[in-house]
Swiss-Prot record:
Listed name of the protein: Presporeless protein A
Biased composition annotated in UniProt, kind: Acidic residues: 374-392
GO biological process terms held by the UniProt record: sporulation resulting in formation of a cellular spore
Species this chain originates from: Dictyostelium discoideum
Job description of the protein: Functions autonomously, very early in the prespore pathway, to control prespore cell differentiation, maybe at the level of transcription. Also required for proper aggregation.
Organism lineage string: Eukaryota, Amoebozoa, Evosea, Eumycetozoa, Dictyostelia
Amino acid sequence: MGRMKVIPEFSNYKIRTPIPIFKNELEIEKYIKGAISYIYSENTAKKLELKKRNDEIKEILNNKNDHEFVEKKIRAIVIQLGDTNLNDRCYLNYLNLYKQPIEFTHGAIMCEKNKYWVAYYASQSLNLDCLNFIIKHKDQFKGLDKDKRIKPIDPKKKISRDLLIGQPITVQCIKEDDLFKFLTVYFNQNGIEFSDSWFSSIVKLIFKGKVYSSDESEKLSTTTTTTTTPNEKYDKKILGEHTVFINKNRDGHLKFSTIPSLLLKISTLMNTGVINEYKQKNYFLETLYNSFPANKHFFNFNEETIQYITNLLLPHLHPLEFKRFNTIPWIIKSKEFIDFIIQHKDFYHLVPSIHKFTKKHENTNLFSASTINDGEEEDDDDDDNDVDGNDDDNNKEKVDDTSNKKDSIVKFKDDITIYLNVRQRFLQFSNFELANYFHTKLLECQKESENQINSNIQSINKEIESLSTSSTNTASSTRSKASSNSNQLKKKEDLEQQIIELQSLLKNKYFSNKEIYYLSFLRALKDCDISTIESIDKVVSIDSDQNNNKFQILFQKSFLENQPLKNGISPEFYDFKKVGPSSHPDVYAEGEYDEHDEYDDYQGKLDNHIDIKDSKFTKDENSRDQLFNYLKSSGFKSFTPSIFCYLLELLLLINTEKSNQQFQEIFKPISTTTTTSTTTTTTTTNLDNINEKIFKLSSDLLIHLVHIVDFKKFSIILDSVNLNRKLILEMIDNCKNKLSFQKRIYEFHDVRSKDYQYDINGHFSTNIKFSDAKDILKKLIDENLFPTSKDWIFIYHSLYISILQSTGVTLNNLLEVNKIYEEHEINYPSVLPNHSNYILDFNNNNNNNNNNNYYGLLNYQPYNNSGNINNESLKNVVSNFVLFYWFHLLDRKLSKLFVRSFSNSNFNEFSSSRLPCLKNSSICRIRSKRHSNTASQIFKSIYELQNFSLLEKYSTFKSYFPEERSYYYNNPSDPFYHPDGSKDFRVLIEEGEFQLAFNHLQLVATKTVSEFPPLTTSRLFQFITLEDVIELINLTTIKNFDESKDESEQQPLLKMWYGKDVKKCKDWILSCAIAKSRLDIVDLLLVKDIEYSTLPSTIEFLTGYKIIKSLFSPECDNQTLEYFLTFSNGIVLPSIKQYLIKDNIATQTKNDVFRVIRHGIGKFELLRTFIPSLGFSSCLIEKMVENRRFETLQYYMEIGLITNEDLTNQQKDQLKYENDLKHLDWVINLNHKKRVNRNQPTFTPNTNSTTATTATPLLQTRSGRTIIPIKK
């Protein structure tokens, strides 16, 4: 929070102090002083008036208890100032000070903006006087929120301290009756509508306990006066810790006595139309919904309060209102909340995600035989019974009353239903901890229910026995005996029937924990945990018939149907009719959800729940081998194809020769179980249910492998399975309806997208051999595995991409592949849609008779028939697909291929204009350093195309633009790119995080780079300590060199930049230290480090351009410059003189020196004491004249830096013309505001003075820039 701007007389006053409740007169006095001085300090011109108003201020302070007098005085001051912003501040300040609005008569004061601030203040503070003022003038406030000129304040953002004069609005307590009186009068059909800030404020105030009922005010002995300022006793209780009115009742619950009634009253207002717009209702409900569980006493609400809030929210729930599960993240994190929901069954309907499971089972018997699991699930190690369950009063009931017994059983059934639903929800969202927790609760509940049922059976058996004994000792009358016997017999039959029903319940298992085993099994695969797999295998492989194995069926259902592949997302994933929002009717109403919304919303939820990026399966090859050996052994009984389908998916994420071999070992056993038969009309598959799923998965895997261009595994599938092409085509058709398939291909090839990287090292695989890719292409075409029609073109597109990236590819190879594509009329892939009218030719000439609409990728001649360059065609088509992949992969070989296909003259002709989005050419410079000249040439050419649509179409390119840093720091192909996406090591060095930087550098120890970060981007030496520099140097020094060890193991980390030479690292540190005037670091290197400072190469470096540039940096002070002018008998002087005096110095040097002169002439004057002959070279004078810096030139002549002899006749004429023009401006008094400040006195240089004084007047150039002259 910022400080209030005050003048020195009142600087001791801290405006942050909460003022509204004044404890003594001194506080009032301080406040009035601070407020008034703040008003005047806003404007420099107004400060003068403050002295005139000292008498008025004294008068105000003398009469500070007379509110009417103070109001009149402040009103007069504000009106006279006449500044709208000041009016707003003063007005709101006065509201906050005296808690009552001022009815200003001046028109400017009661402007629309001020009306809004009054309303805002009233909503935030609920100040009754302010509310009454609004009611009194409600006509003025009508339609306030609809006025487009008034931008309402976002209640989530803090109001500017300037606007509130640094005053936090203190919320008062308000009586419930007063609040609703205001609400009903102010917000009616003819009044002002609710705004968002009102909704937010009222709900927050209610939950903070700021609204109290009349009963409570009487208990607290509060007086109901016209002002609502609380007394001291009331203040302690109400304004203390937000624990107002929270009194513990007998049950130990905290009782919120005001919240339920207040919320119900607001609900009534909503229902009666006072709050009549859906948007406002929605905002209010969402605020309430989100505020309620955030309250720290939430879990201690009693049932009465819960029922109130349930009744309030339920009528207003809309199907779309809380559709996303992640809008209520607290539900998934809190066991207590779930327990709470279970205890209050009415309340859990508020959570649609849980409610859906209840709806799903409303019309089905959860306890039917279909849910019985004959396995011994209780034996699983994961399901411990040591968690204490809830203490249920029903468990302690006596068993005498049959109805009570039945009720207790029904209660257990209800509890089990809820536990099932909640556990299932956590399983679906992969929260294993809570899923196991509620599974344990489920077991406890089942155990309790079994005990209760056994108890009931025993009591019924006793009752039957008592009936049997009583029948022998009953009445003597035959009639009565007969009737008694018949009654007893009927009762006995009823009891026996009850026992049968209870025993049937006892046989049933009220839960199914197959999901627990399934998820535990997948987790064990990920962790290569063979012992867990063994324990699960003992439980689930009871049924020897594979087709009826419930665990296997569950596997197929959960994985093959509902769980898309993690990295190769099957087209089925995009078919939302199957797995998307429409399967949740309680969350999404039919036809009321947005397609893109679904994709974003469900992608994460439906993704495979086993993330193996950092798993043992991925990283430890030995553990993976042991796991495979066990799974293939006879010891593993649950050898099912579905398990190995999952392993196939895991292996997709690993790209090594070993993983390819394991992939083949797994896939072939699956393929041997498939049998296919074909008919003349359609291709049919005669497979059982399991193999049909495997068959379908094969299709999914194939599509995935095409996407990631992994043609080794692709070839394995082609060799092993007769694919159901019709099925694949159907999936693609389904996918096309929902999301562009072509766009997905490009997404999968985005190497910088973390979601789709599949290589174990986090790099995109480009090790496909050209021969392998070509063989697969021939196999696809020769065996007609996939037709070359439009539906299957994506496979050939991806294959072409892999050929472009393959190792060993040459231009002739590509032309050979192009010929195959042409012969079979296969279209080439293209990034640009709807440009099929451009016909490209591979024979370096335009064939107008060629009507095949395809994109040529290499030998495109950008000329039209007249011989002129065809710019329009070039901009749209210029081999952009190759550019796209070269751009992403930054493949030097591929760039050369592309460049060779164009002549240099062609490049020069179409590279005349630059792309507007490029701020400078730093990218091209960097690329030229990092890659070959041909790569730099193509890179430059890409950006010089004005309408290169990829730049607009793919947001990923934005990171390549030179913003604060270039793509250099955010590029996967960069040798120092961090695989996990964290900061680049050069950024870490600039921030002084040396150890982190060098830890990172170890990851790329095999890479090299040619230079340190450029000086201009290094912020390292601004705040760095000397100890840090020593650490940086020590980290680059070899320690304990051992000749017996491999030299590469002992190289310091930074030597990867410069091999074994640490000197350049110190050179870099030295140049940066000079530029930042860090003489302590310079002393460390040049005085204490004798070994470095005495090297001939160091002396040579000190006289080089880098040091000269550092000495002339704006942050290098005169002391540092003088140090180097005298260092080692002035060895730097000659090089400085050479750079400053010679006229033929480089343009860059001219610019550097000129920039230094602009920033301050002090360094130049210091140099003149060491180089008496030093004067301005003609090139620098020429630079000043060229940039029209005539005032600067005149000033340098006045102080003697430049003489008339230094100027040419033309320059003298130009200077004379400028002086004449300047004099003419003075005479005619032209209105050139940006010219020399006429109020400044004429400056006459004092040549005798050696230092600049603070009294030196400022000079202004014609452009308005101020120059601070520094005298000799």
